[in-house]
């Protein structure tokens, strides 16, 4: 049971973290969870715990963003211009530019056509598509070939990013729901035909060993698409393909699911059929 003193220190940590412009819109549940672990690791030393919490947030969130916060307002103005002009090619160019703001989707941009063509060769077009820890991936919807009736359910830990994603999907005419969700704190039992977990498991495992498959097991979808990076943000392989594939396939073999493996660009892809 957390003591009142512990709660006070976590409150202190949360206030210190959210003073930083970089982390002020991160889900409170995420900040408090990392702060709690940092307090234990620092033996109650608050200044040290602040550093540890920021380091943890950088690993799972900050490292994927540019040094300065993206100008989402300006991006939406450019999208408005393209949509109002009825210029589909300009919208696609905007999508590519916007997705390049986030490192995870930037790496996927050169391979978008092949990426979604191959995935949806193995996955039926869903009525409900859920994208967990989505980043800016929902902006790739023009490449997915979804029906007009498909509802895109997207979530991430960054409230500012999710406001932007929701506004962009509205302008793109995509039925959607967006929310701020910490995957290690939230219930994930809402049903969806297909769930995307793109480059998410390594970040989960960094925070809590074994949590990647715990999320997969809990998610209420018959089909889950999981991907892993095969190169670091610095474009080094470091044996990542072998490490991720061996670990993932070993865990999958212990479950009654069927998996299909693909590799496109710097991304190892698994389609899981529960």
Swiss-Prot record:
Binding site for S-adenosyl-L-methionine: 64, 102-104, 108, 133, 156, 182-183, 198, 207
Top-level lineage group: Bacteria
Reaction it catalyzes: guanosine(1405) in 16S rRNA + S-adenosyl-L-methionine = N(7)-methylguanosine(1405) in 16S rRNA + S-adenosyl-L-homocysteine
Name of the top EC class for this enzyme: transferase
Keywords from the named record: Antibiotic resistance, Methyltransferase, rRNA processing, S-adenosyl-L-methionine, Transferase
Coiled coil: none
EC number of this enzyme: 2.1.1.179
Pfam families in alphabetical order: FmrO (PF07091)
Signal peptide stretch: none
Gene Ontology biological-process entries: response to antibiotic
A single GO molecular function term of this UniProt record: rRNA methyltransferase activity
Function: Specifically methylates the N(7) position of guanine 1405 in 16S rRNA. Confers resistance to aminoglycosides.
NCBIfam families reported in the protein's UniProt record: 16S_rRNA_Rmt_gen
UniProt similarity note: Belongs to the methyltransferase superfamily. Aminoglycoside resistance family.
Note: Protects M.rosea, which is an antibiotic-producing bacterium, against self-intoxication.
Protein name: 16S rRNA (guanine(1405)-N(7))-methyltransferase
Organism: Micromonospora rosea
